[in-house]
């Protein structure tokens, strides 16, 4: 029994050590790179069934001709360009710019900034007012038609 436990420990130890190293490596990434990794993980790679979304959730715009079977490097490049465009839009919000950029990438800029009859989001209003207690407003975006979305 002792030998079995000893063998199991040494079989599992490298895997546990590797997972710990991956967490440390993730924590050492710059914030923008962590955002890219998170989007890739939760969004996943979109195939033909997800049209008009391609790559890692890029919504095709008028005049764009990206294929749904694009290579991973192109999808990565497109994701980074989209996130950087969102970041440029929200950079005036300082330390919250990346948070707002990621949220806008997922739900759309209009849901955050408001458009037409859609008012500015309560989350953005709290951030502008300096209120750091906006957790409930942030997680309210994880619902679609009343159902909680995974990711």
Q: Could you describe each region identified by the protein language model?
A:
Residues 87-92:
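Short helix-to-loop capping/linker segments positioned immediately adjacent to catalytic or ligand/cofactor-binding
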Residues 10, 32-36, 93-102, 135:
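Alpha-helical scaffolds flanking conserved acidic
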Residues 4-13:
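Sec-dependent N-terminal signal peptides
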